[in-house]
Regions:
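Short, solvent-exposed loop/turn elements at beta->coil junctions and helix N-caps
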Residues: 98-103
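Ribosome large-subunit tunnel/peptidyl-transferase-proximal elements
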Residues: 1-91, 104-117
Length: 117
């Protein structure tokens, strides 16, 4: 009996998916945009939005929560110095997905995930 239908499987194990979401979110926060497939983009948006919402109080507990998922100190510093002040007045909707078309090799639907300015 399958119960957890709220997330996409993405053809990887749960531990691989967790690591992939952390790595893709780190890249998104560092470069402010990434290119990936549409299902992965939708999952990264969910993960990144939750992290940015957790970071908005900008206190010690928020920093610990962000360090639990993002281990790169430069990215965490950017989150609290650049991104949190940018989205201070915004209640969600920090990212957007732009569809690109299909990838040449395997015809996978591609998208750009970018942080809203």
């Amino acid at each position: 009996m399958i119960k957890n239908l709220n997330t996409r499987k993405l053809a990887v194990t749960p531990s691989h998916k967790k690591a992939m979401m952390r790595n893709m979110t780190t890249s998104l926060f560092l470069h402010e945009q990434i290119t990936t497939t549409i299902p992965r983009a939708k999952e990264v948006v969910r993960f990144a939005e939750k992290l940015l919402t957790k970071a908005k109080p900008a206190d010690l507990n928020a920093k610990k929560a962000i360090y639990a998922d993002i281990s790169n100190k430069d990215v965490v510093k950017k989150v609290f110095d650049v991104l949190v002040p940018r989205y201070k007045e915004r209640n969600g909707g920090y990212t957007q997905i732009l569809k690109l078309g299909t990838r040449k090799g395997d015809s996978a639907q591609m998208a750009i995930v970018k942080l809203v300015i």
